[in-house]
C-alpha cells in the first residue's frame, strides 16, 4: 500500500497538474478530493496542451482509475462539457469514477456567486463566480443536492423545488433580481446526470479497496494551502480544505493510509484575485516574470499577481499539511534576473516574525525580510539533473529547501512533463 498527496504550498497555480501528471506514471489510481471547476490545471500530453477543471490529471492513462471524490462540488454541465472536450480529442474516459456523495452545483449557485460578489463591491474576495462557495454553503446547511439525488428524478425534483422557494425569496427580496422556475433546471440537469451516471459509484470503496490491495494511489489537491478555508488568508480563500488533511474528509480514506505529501511550489510566488500578498512585485521584474512564466489564470484568464518566493508561506504550508517532499517548479522563469530575492521572515513593528500571521491587519503591516542571491543567465530548460544546473541556480534551489525545511524531490525547468526531473522517488 502506498499513497501520495500532491498539494499546492502557495495560493494555487503552482503547477500541481503537471506534477500529478508526472507522478501518475507510477500511480494506479488518481483522485481529487476538494474544490470544483474553479481550479484549472494545464497538462501537456504527447505534445498537446489540455486544460482541465474537474477531471483528474490521470485521465490520459487508460490503465489508471481516476476518481472525483465526495469532497468536491460538481457542476454537471461543466463536467459533461469537459468529458466532450476529451472525447473530441480521442481521450478514453471509461476509467473515470464519480462519488455518489459529491454535491452538485446548480444555476442558482452560479447566480448567487455573481450577485453576492457584486453586492460586496470594494470588499469582494475575488471569487471565480463558478458557484463553488454557495454550493458548499448549502452542503454545510444540509440542504445540498448530491449526485445520488441528481440521478433520481423524483428526489431531485423534490429537493430542487424546496430549495428554489428559499433561493428565489433571496434573489427577489434581498438582491432584487429575478429567480428561477423549476422547469428552467429540472430536465436539463437531470439529463446531465444521466450522461454521467455510468461513472457514478461509492468512490470511498474504490479507493480503500485499491489501498488494501497494495495499489499506488495519488491524491490531487486543487488551489493551495494559502487558499484553505481554515489555514489560508481568510476570508480571501476558497470554500474547502486543499490541505492534505482534506484528503481524509473529501475522499473517505482514513489518515493512517496517507504516506507522502508532496508540496508543489513555484520558484517565485503568484496569486489570482484579492487578498494579502507580502512579497508582491509592482515593477519590471514582476512584469518579466508574469510574461515569461505566462502567469494568466487557466480558469479566468486573469493576470496573476507575481512576487518573490516566500519561505514564511511555504513553511506554514509544510506545518499544516505535513509536507514531506518539495517539488519546485518554473525555475527556468527566473533565468536572466541579475539578483534574486527570497523572503526569509517578516518584520512587524520592528519585530521579526517567522510564522505566518492569522490577522490580516497584522499581515498588512508586515514587511518582507529578504535574502539576496545571484541569478544566472544560462538556458536551463534542457537540464535533466541537479548537477547540470548552473552553480547559482543550484544554490537557489538548495536555499529554498533549507529555508522551508522540505527535502527536494522534484524540480522543473519548463512546462513540458519531459522538463520535470525526479531527485528521489515517493512511491514505495
Swiss-Prot record:
Metal-binding in keyword set: yes
EC assignment: 6.3.4.4
Co-factor requirement: Mg(2+)
Keywords annotated in UniProt: Cytoplasm, GTP-binding, Ligase, Magnesium, Metal-binding, Nucleotide-binding, Purine biosynthesis
Binding site residues for substrate: 298-304
MF (Gene Ontology): adenylosuccinate synthase activity; GTP binding; magnesium ion binding
UniProt-listed PROSITE patterns: ADENYLOSUCCIN_SYN_1 (PS01266), ADENYLOSUCCIN_SYN_2 (PS00513)
Catalyzed chemical reaction(s): IMP + L-aspartate + GTP = N(6)-(1,2-dicarboxyethyl)-AMP + GDP + phosphate + 2 H(+)
Keyword Ligase listed: yes
Function of the protein: Plays an important role in the de novo pathway of purine nucleotide biosynthesis. Catalyzes the first committed step in the biosynthesis of AMP from IMP.
Protein's UniProt name: Adenylosuccinate synthetase
Species of provenance: Halalkalibacterium halodurans (strain ATCC BAA-125 / DSM 18197 / FERM 7344 / JCM 9153 / C-125) (Bacillus halodurans)
Amino acid at each position: 500500500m502506498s499513497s501520495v498527496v500532491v498539494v499546492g504550498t502557495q495560493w494555487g497555480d503552482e503547477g500541481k497538474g503537471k506534477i500529478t501528471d508526472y507522478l501518475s506514471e507510477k500511480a494506479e489510481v488518481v483522485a481529487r478530493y476538494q474544490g470544483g471547476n474553479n481550479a484549472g490545471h494545464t497538462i501537456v500530453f504527447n505534445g498537446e496542451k489540455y486544460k482541465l477543471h474537474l477531471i483528474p490529471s490521470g485521465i490520459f492513462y487508460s490503465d489508471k482509475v481516476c476518481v472525483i471524490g465526495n469532497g468536491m462540488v460538481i457542476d454537471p454541465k461543466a463536467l459533461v462539457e469537459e468529458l466532450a472536450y476529451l472525447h473530441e480529442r480521442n481521450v478514453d474516459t471509461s476509467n473515470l469514477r464519480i462519488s455518489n456523495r459529491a454535491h452538485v452545483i446548480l444555476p442558482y449557485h452560479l447566480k448567487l456567486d455573481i450577485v453576492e460578489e457584486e453586492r460586496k463591491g470594494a470588499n469582494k474576495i475575488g471569487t471565480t463566480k463558478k458557484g463553488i462557495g454557495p454550493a458548499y454553503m448549502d452542503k454545510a446547511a444540509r440542504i445540498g443536492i448530491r449526485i445520488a439525488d441528481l440521478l433520481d428524478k423524483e428526489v431531485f425534483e423534490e429537493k430542487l423545488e424546496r430549495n428554489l422557494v428559499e433561493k428565489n425569496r433571496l434573489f427577489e427580496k434581498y438582491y432584487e433580481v429575478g429567480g428561477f422556475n423549476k422547469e428552467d433546471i429540472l430536465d436539463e440537469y437531470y439529463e446531465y446526470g444521466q450522461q454521467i451516471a455510468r461513472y457514478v459509484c461509492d468512490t470511498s470503496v474504490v479507493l480503500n479497496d485499491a489501498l488494501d490491495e497494495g495499489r499506488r494511489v495519488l491524491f490531487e489537491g486543487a488551489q493551495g494551502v494559502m487558499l484553505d478555508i481554515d489555514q489560508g488568508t481568510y476570508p480571501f480563500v476558497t470554500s474547502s480544505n486543499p490541505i492534505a488533511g482534506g484528503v481524509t474528509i473529501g475522499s473517505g480514506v482514513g489518515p493512517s493510509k496517507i504516506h507522502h505529501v508532496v508540496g508543489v511550489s513555484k520558484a517565485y510566488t503568484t496569486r489570482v484575485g484579492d487578498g494579502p500578498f507580502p512579497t508582491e512585485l509592482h515593477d519590471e521584474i514582476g512584469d518579466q516574470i508574469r510574461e515569461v512564466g505566462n502567469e494568466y489564470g487557466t480558469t479566468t484568464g486573469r493576470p496573476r499577481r507575481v512576487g518573490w518566493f516566500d519561505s514564511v508561506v511555504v513553511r506554514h504550508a509544510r506545518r499544516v499539511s505535513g509536507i514531506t517532499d518539495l517539488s519546485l517548479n518554473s525555475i527556468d522563469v527566473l533565468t536572466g534576473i541579475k539578483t534574486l530575492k527570497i523572503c526569509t521572515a517578516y518584520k512587524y513593528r520592528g519585530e521579526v516574525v517567522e510564522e505566518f500571521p492569522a490577522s490580516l491587519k497584522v499581515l498588512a503591516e508586515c514587511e518582507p525580510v529578504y535574502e539576496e542571491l545571484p541569478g544566472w543567465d544560462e538556458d536551463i530548460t534542457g537540464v535533466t539533473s541537479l548537477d547540470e544546473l548552473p552553480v547559482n541556480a543550484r544554490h537557489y534551489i538548495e536555499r529554498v529547501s533549507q529555508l522551508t525545511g522540505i527535502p527536494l524531490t522534484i524540480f522543473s525547468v519548463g512546462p513540458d512533463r519531459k522538463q520535470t526531473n525526479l531527485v528521489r522517488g515517493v512511491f514505495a
